[in-house]
C-alpha cells in the first residue's frame, strides 16, 4: 500500500504529540458539541483518507461507517469508488491512410486505490481524461480506415490497455473503452455508397449470369435425353398440348404426327 511508503519515513516529533494532546483536550472539553464537527459518516461507496498534521495517517482509507476526525490537526478527503463514465470529446484526426475522421468514444473507470489517487497525482480524474484523449488519438493514427470500420473492439481493447497501464500508478483502474461513432467526410460517404452500390449490381449480374448458365445446361441435358428417347419426346409433346388447351384462349392447335414432323425436319 502507498500509505506504508509514506509512513515508513515518518517519525512523530515532540510537537506532534503536543498537538495531538491539545486536539483531544479540546474535543473532550467541548463535548458533546464537538461530536457534530468531529464525527463523520462515510457511505458504502466512499472511502475517507485522513491527513494528520499534513501527513498521511494510517495506511488504509477509512470507511464505510463512522469515522472520528480530530479538530485542528486532521484534514480529510472523501473518494468515490463507483465507476465513472467519461465521454471523450470528438477527436478529429488523420488515419494511417490519410483520411480525416471524427471519433466519439467513452471511457469507464473507477478509483482502485484512494490514497494513491490523492498522493500521487494532483487531479486523478482530470489526468485520466486527458490521457484518454491523447491515447485514443495515438492509437487511431496508426490504423487505416478499413481497420477502424471493422475492428472497433480491438482498438478499444488496445486503448484500454494503454490507459490502464498508465493510470494504475495513480490508483485508477480503467474498466472499459467504447468506440461509439466514427464519422467520415461527406465526400467519402458518397464515394463509399457508390462503391457499395456498384458492388451489389456486379454481384447481382454474376448471380443472374450463373443462373442462366445453369438453366441452359439443364435445357441442353434435357434435350439430349429427349433426342435419345422417341417415347419421351412424344410424351413431352402431348404434355405441351394439354397445357395449351388448359386455359381459355383463342389459340387453335392442329397436332401433327411426330413421324411427319421428323420427315420435314430431315428434309
From Swiss-Prot:
It is a single-pass membrane protein. InterPro entries: Band-7_stomatin-like, Band_7, Band_7/SPFH_dom_sf, Band_7/stomatin-like_CS, Stomatin_HflK_fam. GO terms for cellular component: plasma membrane. Keywords: Membrane, Transmembrane, Transmembrane helix. It comes from Caenorhabditis elegans. The chain crosses the membrane at residues 17-37. Its main location: membrane. It is found in: Membrane. Belongs to the band 7/mec-2 family. The keyword Isomerase does not apply. It comes from the Eukaryota. This is Stomatin-3. The lineage of its organism: Eukaryota, Metazoa, Ecdysozoa, Nematoda, Chromadorea.
Amino acid at each position: 500500500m502507498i500509505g506504508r511508503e509514506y509512513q515508513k519515513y515518518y517519525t512523530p516529533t515532540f510537537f506532534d504529540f503536543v498537538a495531538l494532546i491539545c486536539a483531544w483536550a479540546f474535543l473532550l472539553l467541548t463535548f458533546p458539541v464537538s461530536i457534530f464537527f468531529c464525527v463523520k459518516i462515510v457511505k458504502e461507496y466512499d472511502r475517507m483518507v485522513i491527513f494528520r498534521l499534513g501527513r498521511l495517517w494510517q495506511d488504509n482509507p477509512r470507511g464505510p461507517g463512522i469515522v472520528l476526525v480530530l479538530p485542528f490537526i486532521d484534514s480529510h478527503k472523501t473518494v468515490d469508488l463507483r465507476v465513472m463514465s467519461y465521454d471523450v470529446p470528438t477527436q478529429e484526426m488523420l488515419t494511417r491512410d490519410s483520411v480525416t475522421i471524427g471519433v466519439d468514444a467513452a471511457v469507464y473507470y473507477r478509483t482502485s486505490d484512494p490514497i494513491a489517487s490523492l498522493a500521487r497525482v494532483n487531479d486523478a480524474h482530470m489526468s485520466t481524461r486527458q490521457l484518454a484523449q491523447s491515447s485514443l488519438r495515438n492509437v487511431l493514427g496508426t490504423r487505416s480506415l478499413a481497420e477502424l470500420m471493422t475492428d472497433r473492439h480491438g482498438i478499444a481493447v488496445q486503448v484500454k490497455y494503454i490507459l490502464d497501464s498508465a493510470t494504475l500508478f495513480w490508483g485508477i483502474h480503467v474498466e472499459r473503452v467504447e468506440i461509439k461513432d466514427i464519422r467520415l467526410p461527406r465526400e467519402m460517404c458518397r464515394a463509399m455508397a457508390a462503391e457499395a452500390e456498384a458492388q451489389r449490381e456486379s454481384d447481382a449480374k454474376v448471380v443472374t449470369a450463373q443462373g442462366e448458365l445453369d438453366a441452359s445446361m439443364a435445357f441442353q441435358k434435357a434435350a439430349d435425353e429427349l433426342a435419345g428417347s422417341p417415347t419421351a419426346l412424344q410424351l413431352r409433346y402431348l404434355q405441351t398440348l394439354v397445357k395449351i388447351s388448359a386455359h381459355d384462349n383463342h389459340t387453335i392447335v392442329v397436332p401433327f404426327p411426330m413421324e411427319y414432323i421428323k420427315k420435314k425436319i430431315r428434309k
